[in-house]
Amino acid sequence: MKYPIGIQSFENIIEDGFVYVDKTDLVYSLATEGKVYFLSRPRKFGKSLLVSTLKCYFEGRKELFKGLAIDSLETDWYHYPVFHLSFGGQNFPEPYTLDKVLDEFVSEAESIYGKGPFAQTLSSRFKAVLGNAHKKTGKRAVVLIDEYDKPLLDVMDAEMTITTDYGKIGLEEYNRNLLKGFYSVFKEADADLRFVFLTGVTKFSQVSVFSGFNQPDDISLSPEYETLCGITEEEMLSVFAEPIEKMSKSYGCDYDGMVAMLKKQYDGYHFSKEMTEIYNPFSLLNALKKGDIQNYWFRTGTPTYLIRLMEHFSENLYELTGRYMPNRTSLTTKPTWSVLCR
């Protein structure tokens, strides 16, 4: 069995024969029952893979979905103009990094669909591109934004200021205003949009980056979509029965005992009032591949912005976790934070 650890491309997972836990029935529901969505999930929880899956679906890549749930649901497989923007690979502590990233994104789109004759600002240029794409293809545009909140999280504790036409403001406020203006396009270009999906690890207040356009449908705690990211126990037992059995032998326990150990370490996420238990996919896949239960998520998934904020305080770990930590009673270093993360 090939485990797609670190692979965020749906196309690569399918074409290269990696194991895929089928979520395409929910993808179909998203695409056909709504228009503008927001989803918040922890890091390393499959958000980028979900965005990639949506991209392939809206590009009409029918061949990639053969044998999956959506194969029997979708009949048209239209190819829409898709605009995919990910902030995940960027670092935003430096001034004007966000400006550059957005400019490159819009410029690339303009090279395909053309520029607006009077568009000057980033938001007006993007609006013009969406309109051009609609006219050129006859299909309304799809916009997918991954890690929408990273330009803000990266600068939450930044003390740097930027001089604007209205005076000096903090870098966080500058990035917030820039994103607010950019996302306002979704309201102005509504007639040219087929689908909009934003994902991240946090949701900022309603008066921040989303206030410039109609509020998206926040499905973060929706019972219908609680299993959209992550792995349920039913999915784990169905897809990964063989590696669990193999792992149980190395741990000297039976199958049920191994399931209980995996459940204790990686289960326990809940994303709706239904309280369906969700396993952390990154940690679970690593454990099954390596045959070893470890804190895999902490090594790569710890929210750095939270670490930076917590370093300004000294917190009692017992009060935070309910666990007794001898000789490690204060949350003042990065290693100490690992006790909170599975």
Label each PLM-derived region with a short phrase.
Residues 1-342:
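Phosphate-binding site recognition
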